[in-house]
């Protein structure tokens, strides 16, 4: 089982049709942007101030889990500033010349968006430093003894960097961003508003409780919410009257094996293995990998993060431990003979 099989994974690659739909329903202004109230308020002030001064917005770093709207926010920044957005990603910029070509084509105050900025090569990153600080491009012409450095002046611009792994950014790069924003998982209320708005833009008939139920199963992530909405739309069209209500959502997502808290078959299999085969743990990663027939990297990077974040498991020095939430979720009896680690965990 791999992550691309999971409908509730924010990392799952989207089809061309899904990308077209996502662009159509993506908010274009801060007024349309639901959730992230602190980020929205701060960016509104920073953008208004920059526009009043006729300056480029400070370089902005946006980080957080996948699917929370980093690309959407970069588009909104460009729209609100009334400038063009040029998009690229860290892995694409292999050589200094790749970045130089982008930078020299920017107009005044334009926004350059680099997704996965933590994956920039060191050579490209070095070129970026003077561009961010002094709006200058420092490049070498020629080779050997005849090589010389030339400086190219750049128009003022805004670099917006996005990453899911801010800890992998080098300090020199991170320190050059004047604005740093962290996107948090969305509340169910905010997600239900996003689902309702998307449904209306797609001309779908949806009830309030239908939108709320999709939101509850979306793991706090708009990308997942919009994907589930599209799948429920298909179910409502074929098996119902076309109206997306609570009953239709429940039947559609049950068919897709997405439970009321957003867990799928991989989450269920992991938790039940931990509780039923290993009495709740502690269990080492190697043992879980063998029991599930999954790669260790898949378990650590795909399955466990959401379970840990929601408090269903804990990682300890001795291994993985199921929490009281996990036992309650599956209505399982807590074993009588628990380890000291488990007793402490379940009493929290």
UniProtKB/Swiss-Prot annotation:
<feature type="region of interest" description="Small ATPAse domain (RuvB-S)">
    <location>
        <begin position="187"/>
        <end position="257"/>
    </location>
</feature>
<feature type="binding site">
    <location>
        <position position="26"/>
    </location>
    <ligand>
        <name>ATP</name>
    </ligand>
</feature>
<comment type="function">
    <text>The RuvA-RuvB-RuvC complex processes Holliday junction (HJ) DNA during genetic recombination and DNA repair, while the RuvA-RuvB complex plays an important role in the rescue of blocked DNA replication forks via replication fork reversal (RFR). RuvA specifically binds to HJ cruciform DNA, conferring on it an open structure. The RuvB hexamer acts as an ATP-dependent pump, pulling dsDNA into and through the RuvAB complex. RuvB forms 2 homohexamers on either side of HJ DNA bound by 1 or 2 RuvA tetramers; 4 subunits per hexamer contact DNA at a time.</text>
</comment>
<dbReference type="InterPro" id="IPR008823">
    <property type="entry name" value="RuvB_C"/>
</dbReference>
<feature type="binding site">
    <location>
        <position position="71"/>
    </location>
    <ligand>
        <name>ATP</name>
    </ligand>
</feature>
<keyword id="KW-0547">Nucleotide-binding</keyword>
<dbReference type="InterPro" id="IPR004605">
    <property type="entry name" value="DNA_helicase_Holl-junc_RuvB"/>
</dbReference>
<feature type="region of interest" description="Head domain (RuvB-H)">
    <location>
        <begin position="260"/>
        <end position="348"/>
    </location>
</feature>
<comment type="similarity">
    <text>Belongs to the RuvB family.</text>
</comment>
<dbReference type="GO" id="GO:0006281">
    <property type="term" value="P:DNA repair"/>
</dbReference>
<feature type="binding site">
    <location>
        <position position="25"/>
    </location>
    <ligand>
        <name>ATP</name>
    </ligand>
</feature>
<feature type="binding site">
    <location>
        <position position="67"/>
    </location>
    <ligand>
        <name>ATP</name>
    </ligand>
</feature>
<dbReference type="Pfam" id="PF17864">
    <property type="entry name" value="AAA_lid_4"/>
</dbReference>
<feature type="binding site">
    <location>
        <position position="223"/>
    </location>
    <ligand>
        <name>ATP</name>
    </ligand>
</feature>
<dbReference type="InterPro" id="IPR003593">
    <property type="entry name" value="AAA+_ATPase"/>
</dbReference>
<feature type="region of interest" description="Large ATPase domain (RuvB-L)">
    <location>
        <begin position="4"/>
        <end position="186"/>
    </location>
</feature>
<feature type="binding site">
    <location>
        <position position="186"/>
    </location>
    <ligand>
        <name>ATP</name>
    </ligand>
</feature>
<dbReference type="InterPro" id="IPR036390">
    <property type="entry name" value="WH_DNA-bd_sf"/>
</dbReference>
<dbReference type="Pfam" id="PF05491">
    <property type="entry name" value="RuvB_C"/>
</dbReference>
<dbReference type="GO" id="GO:0000400">
    <property type="term" value="F:four-way junction DNA binding"/>
</dbReference>
<keyword id="KW-0227">DNA damage</keyword>
<dbReference type="GO" id="GO:0006310">
    <property type="term" value="P:DNA recombination"/>
</dbReference>
<dbReference type="GO" id="GO:0016887">
    <property type="term" value="F:ATP hydrolysis activity"/>
</dbReference>
<keyword id="KW-0067">ATP-binding</keyword>
<dbReference type="GO" id="GO:0005524">
    <property type="term" value="F:ATP binding"/>
</dbReference>
<dbReference type="InterPro" id="IPR008824">
    <property type="entry name" value="RuvB-like_N"/>
</dbReference>
<feature type="binding site">
    <location>
        <position position="72"/>
    </location>
    <ligand>
        <name>ATP</name>
    </ligand>
</feature>
<feature type="binding site">
    <location>
        <position position="70"/>
    </location>
    <ligand>
        <name>ATP</name>
    </ligand>
</feature>
<keyword id="KW-0234">DNA repair</keyword>
<feature type="binding site">
    <location>
        <begin position="133"/>
        <end position="135"/>
    </location>
    <ligand>
        <name>ATP</name>
    </ligand>
</feature>
<dbReference type="GO" id="GO:0005737">
    <property type="term" value="C:cytoplasm"/>
</dbReference>
<keyword id="KW-0233">DNA recombination</keyword>
<feature type="binding site">
    <location>
        <position position="176"/>
    </location>
    <ligand>
        <name>ATP</name>
    </ligand>
</feature>
<keyword id="KW-0378">Hydrolase</keyword>
<keyword id="KW-0238">DNA-binding</keyword>
<protein>
    <recommendedName>
        <fullName>Holliday junction branch migration complex subunit RuvB</fullName>
        <ecNumber>3.6.4.-</ecNumber>
    </recommendedName>
</protein>
<feature type="binding site">
    <location>
        <position position="320"/>
    </location>
    <ligand>
        <name>DNA</name>
    </ligand>
</feature>
<dbReference type="GO" id="GO:0009378">
    <property type="term" value="F:four-way junction helicase activity"/>
</dbReference>
<dbReference type="Pfam" id="PF05496">
    <property type="entry name" value="RuvB_N"/>
</dbReference>
<dbReference type="InterPro" id="IPR027417">
    <property type="entry name" value="P-loop_NTPase"/>
</dbReference>
<comment type="subunit">
    <text>Homohexamer. Forms an RuvA(8)-RuvB(12)-Holliday junction (HJ) complex. HJ DNA is sandwiched between 2 RuvA tetramers; dsDNA enters through RuvA and exits via RuvB. An RuvB hexamer assembles on each DNA strand where it exits the tetramer. Each RuvB hexamer is contacted by two RuvA subunits (via domain III) on 2 adjacent RuvB subunits; this complex drives branch migration. In the full resolvosome a probable DNA-RuvA(4)-RuvB(12)-RuvC(2) complex forms which resolves the HJ.</text>
</comment>
<feature type="binding site">
    <location>
        <position position="315"/>
    </location>
    <ligand>
        <name>DNA</name>
    </ligand>
</feature>
């Amino acid at each position: 089982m791999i992550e691309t099989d999971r409908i509730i994974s924010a990392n799952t690659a989207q089809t061309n049709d899904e990308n077209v739909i996502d662009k159509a329903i993506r908010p274009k202004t801060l007024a349309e942007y639901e959730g992230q109230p602190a980020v929205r308020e701060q960016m509104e002030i920073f953008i208004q101030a920059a526009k009043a001064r006729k300056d480029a917005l400070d370089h902005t770093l946006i980080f957080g889990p996948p699917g929370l709207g980093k690309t959407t926010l970069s588009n909104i920044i460009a729209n609100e500033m009334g400038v063009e957005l040029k998009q690229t990603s860290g892995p694409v910029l292999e050589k200094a010349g790749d970045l130089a070509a982008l930078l020299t084509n920017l107009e005044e105050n334009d926004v350059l968006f680099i997704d996965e900025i933590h994956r920039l090569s060191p050579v490209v990153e070095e070129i970026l430093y003077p561009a961010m600080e002094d709006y200058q491009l420092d490049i070498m012409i020629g080779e050997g003894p005849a090589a010389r450095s030339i400086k190219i002046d750049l128009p003022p611009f805004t670099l917006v960097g996005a990453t899911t792994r801010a800890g992998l950014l080098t300090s020199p790069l991170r320190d050059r961003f004047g604005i740093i924003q962290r996107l948090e998982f969305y509340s169910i209320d905010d997600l239900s508003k996003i689902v309702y708005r998307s449904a209306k833009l797609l001309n779908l008939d949806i009830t309030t409780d239908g939108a709320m139920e999709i939101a509850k199963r979306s793991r706090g992530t708009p990308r997942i919410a919009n994907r589930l909405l599209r799948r429920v739309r298909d179910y409502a069209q074929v098996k119902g009257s076309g109206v997306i209500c609570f009953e239709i959502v429940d039947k559609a997502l049950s068919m897709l094996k997405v439970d009321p808290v957003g867990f799928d078959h991989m989450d269920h299999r992991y938790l039940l293995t931990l509780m039923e085969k290993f009495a709740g743990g502690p269990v080492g990663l190697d043992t879980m990998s063998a029991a599930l027939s999954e790669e260790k990297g898949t378990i650590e990077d795909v399955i466990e993060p959401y379970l840990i974040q929601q408090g269903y498991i804990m990682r300890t020095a001795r291994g993985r431990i199921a929490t009281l939430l996990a036992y309650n979720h599956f209505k399982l009896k807590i074993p009588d003979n628990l380890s000291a680690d488990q007793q402490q965990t379940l009493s929290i």
